[in-house]
Swiss-Prot record:
UniProt keyword annotation of Transmembrane present: no
Pfam families for this protein: Ribosomal_S19
Superkingdom, natural source: Bacteria
Annotated source species: Amoebophilus asiaticus (strain 5a2)
Protein name (record): Small ribosomal subunit protein uS19
Lineage: Bacteria, Pseudomonadati, Bacteroidota, Cytophagia, Cytophagales
Length: 91
């Protein structure tokens, strides 16, 4: 179910403050965040965000195509190690 338009997109306040500070200073630092549910806005474009996946921080470089998506979509939480191979010679 989509979020109401009158409410606007969810963005963590601490993350928005950090992005605004970096945009004003012009530096290109990596920002660590645990806020996987924050929506990517146009202010984020061109920055690298380290998104926590429950184990470690995954660096995500934000491009224009990512605007409107959530940060958690680009930091997978589960690792797929493959299905077990059947042994044909088993008797």
């Amino acid at each position: 179910m989509a979020r109401s338009i009158k409410k606007g997109p969810y963005i963590a306040h601490h993350l928005l403050k950090k992005i605004d500070a970096i945009n004003e200073s012009g530096s290109k630092n990596t920002i660590k965040t645990w806020s996987r549910s924050s929506t990517i806005t146009p202010e984020f474009v061109g920055h690298t965000l380290a998104v926590h996946n429950g184990n470690k921080f995954i660096p995500v470089f934000v491009t224009e195509n990512m605007v409107g998506h959530k940060l958690g979509e680009f930091s997978p939480t589960r690792t797929f190690k493959g299905h077990t191979k059947k042994n044909k010679n088993k008797k």
